[in-house]
Amino acid sequence: MKLVADVGNTNTVFGIWNRGKILKNWRISTGRLETEDEMYVVLKQLLEAGNVDLKSIEDICVASVVPRLNSIFHYFGRKYLELDPVLVTAIDGIGVKWDVDFPSEIGADRVANVIGAHEFYGKDAIVIDTGTAITVDVLKDGAFIGGAILPGPMMAMRALFSKTAKLPEVDLFYVENHIGKNTEDNIRIGVVNGTYYALKAIISKVKEELGDKIPVIATGGNSPMFNIGNGFFDILDSDLTLKGIAVFCERVRKLEKNSAG
């Protein structure tokens, strides 16, 4: 079994990958992973609750957008499991070409999403990941050709709250009418509805350039918030990032084995 981790700015999602499937997953606050020992305590509790023996973990695979935690995962792996984790990056030789200006700048989560989309849904896809930031990743003919980044709904709302004197934090959801009658709905319409239409416009423009038949795959914790009515997501795969991390890991280990002879 593999332990896979999608480390985000706000939350981290751990998963157990075995025989081509994510068997279990857990979402925790990234702030709980400040040292290798804290990571051990958290993971031991999660795995025990899921009836998974920590000693059954044979590999660790991590996609992190929080660079300072990369070393923590290495310390944890070596100290408690005698394993060196695989860190997801945009490298050559793993089945996807990186047709962008600076592949080294692609976030690990985006690499994992592209790998996962390519492995499970084919060589053409638009992937929408709705986390702290929202990413749009475009896969065409088996190559990552670019995308877009925009603020996620929580980030946008907290920017309003922190930069103004009177605007409150509110629960976020899509509002059916588009003329708010109170401050809370005004914020929801601006933040959630506004993001919905921004995504819809971006996807429409991408399809104009590449063709209408390219599927739109959604992942990330806020994806259901934007799949309103006849939504523009063709596929909702909450495990896409974890699956992509696991596939990346398997391909890297195969490359390492082949290079070792």
Curated annotation (Swiss-Prot):
GO molecular function: ATP binding; metal ion binding; pantothenate kinase activity
Active site residues per record: 109 (proton acceptor)
List of residues binding substrate: 107-110, 183
Cofactors required: NH4(+); K(+)
UniProt xrefs under InterPro entries: ATPase_NBD, Type_III_PanK
Alphabetical list of Gene3D superfamilies matching this protein: 3.30.420.40
Catalytic reaction list: (R)-pantothenate + ATP = (R)-4'-phosphopantothenate + ADP + H(+)
Keyword Transmembrane among record annotations: no
NCBIfam families xref list: baf (TIGR00671), PRK13318.1-6 (NF009848)
Subunit and partners: Homodimer.
Protein's job: Catalyzes the phosphorylation of pantothenate (Pan), the first step in CoA biosynthesis.
Protein name: Type III pantothenate kinase
Lineage summary: Bacteria, Thermotogati, Thermotogota, Thermotogae, Kosmotogales
